[in-house]
């Protein structure tokens, strides 16, 4: 019994080995739906190549002028699905199986087959959708392409307007920050003798010229008042000099008394 069991196990092992070494038929009907079930890098690369072959075949077919518009739409939908499936395999190869980074390589080259289609914002098919071959000449697709071009121009114009507004806003902010940093000393409203700022009534920041004129007028008025006071003092001094002395007063009184006595004898 043990001998028969060993023979059976060896036969089973040989069967598994032959299955693993046998070439895989990478037909699209046999392509696994669960990408993560493939754990060997070589198999994942093979399935990716099979998708590329299918994409190339359908790109040739969608450019055929003999097929109907219905067939063109059908092929275009299939191409979008194939490109999405190809991208999923590329992520699996790079992230899970640590293989080549096809995403980065294809993103930096124009030779990728996906670049043969035009990328359009289509709300019915999803946010973005690609149209290949004759699908780009379909009436509804042409209309969407024109609308997308207009939207891109409007977005560019809005970006330019936003840029201009941001520049103006920066200038205003810069002016405000500069205006806030300028104090009263900048306009000459600082009294160095008293070591203090002048009052707001004397320092009208709105018009420095007016403030200067008011300040100068005040200085002239003060000088004129001082001059008038000096003249008044001089006049007072002169009147004090005219006051008679005691001798003069006595002489005047004697003369006055003499005149009174003489008038009595007459």
UniProtKB/Swiss-Prot annotation:
GO CC term (a single one): post-spliceosomal complex
Keyword Metal-binding among record annotations: no
Subcellular compartments: Cytoplasm; Nucleus
Record keywords: Cytoplasm, mRNA processing, mRNA splicing, Nucleus, Spliceosome
Gene Ontology biological process: generation of catalytic spliceosome for second transesterification step; mRNA 3'-splice site recognition
Region listing for Disordered, in residue ranges: 147-177
Methyltransferase keyword on record: no
Protein function: Involved in pre-mRNA splicing.
Family per similarity comment: Belongs to the ISY1 family.
UniProt protein name: Pre-mRNA-splicing factor ISY1
